[in-house]
């Protein structure tokens, strides 16, 4: 009876659970077989990571890299992306994995960009692109750009990413002269673009500004051209016009509407 119960319990386990049990016992090959049984299209990020770790244990570095990169198509769980990038870095050189191309990226932000770095590198790795990354210090994007002797220009990047957010706009909560304030703010950003192009050959990629959800005047805000909310919309529009083909804009306002703010 106990044997029958045990067999019944074993048969009810999912492939991933069986794989976990095998891996815990050190039976890595059996764990891989079980995990592969549970692979869906696309597999979960957790399962991709487990397979990558198993292949790393078996010194199959190429497969470890392949499954680490598969995390990109498996969801947006940050911890999985972070672990996947660390695992990929450990195994890529051992696997002698060739990169289709290599690019030097300078990441400048008005917020902490530490979490963005591994996600950016892993996503690029999935496309066969190796990123040599320069990360500016927290909130130092303007200082880096204005100082022609800064680490930014010494790095000589191919791409400069301006990862900035709405809180860094130099706009009041309400303005009696909204057109002038918008013009000044747009001029500040386009001036930074000009400095980058004067001191480097880098392509600029800038995040535009996601509008805040909670605003003091609520629905009335759209009737107030001098409100920060409406001025931010105007800045986004004007930056889009000014960018033309010279600067690539990431529409964070649209993305936040899709994903959440």
Model-found features: residue ranges?
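Alpha-helical cap/lid subdomain in secreted, periplasmic
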Residues: 6, 10-11, 17-20, 37-44, ...
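A short, compositionally biased domain-edge/stem linker segment
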Residues: 85-96
């Amino acid at each position: 009876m106990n044997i029958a119960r045990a067999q019944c319990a074993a048969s009810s386990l999912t492939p991933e659970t069986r794989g976990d049990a095998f891996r815990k016992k050190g039976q890595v090959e059996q764990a891989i077989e079980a995990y592969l049984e549970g692979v869906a299209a696309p597999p979960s990020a957790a399962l991709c990571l487990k397979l990558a770790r198993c292949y790393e244990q078996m010194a199959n570095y190429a497969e470890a890299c392949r499954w680490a990169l598969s995390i990109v198509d498996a969801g947006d769980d940050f911890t999985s992306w972070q672990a996947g990038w660390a695992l990929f870095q450990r195994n890529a050189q051992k696997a002698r994995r060739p990169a289709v191309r290599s690019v030097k990226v300078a990441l400048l932000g008005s917020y902490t960009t530490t979490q963005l770095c591994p996600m950016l590198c892993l996503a690029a790795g999935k496309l066969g692109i190796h990123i040599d990354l320069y990360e500016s210090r927290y909130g130092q994007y303007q200082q880096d750009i204005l100082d022609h002797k800064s680490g930014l220009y010494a790095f000589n990047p191919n791409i400069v990413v301006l990862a900035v957010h709405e809180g860094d706009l130099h706009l009041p909560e309400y303005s009696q002269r909204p057109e002038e304030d918008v013009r000044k703010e747009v001029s500040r950003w386009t001036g930074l673009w000009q400095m980058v192009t004067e001191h480097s050959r880098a392509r600029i990629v800038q995040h535009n500004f996601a509008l805040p959800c909670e605003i003091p005047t609520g629905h009335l805000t759209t009737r107030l051209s001098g409100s920060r909310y409406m001025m931010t919309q105007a800045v986004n529009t004007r930056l889009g016009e000014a960018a033309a083909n010279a600067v690539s804009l990431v529409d964070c306002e649209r993305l936040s509407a899709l994903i959440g703010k």
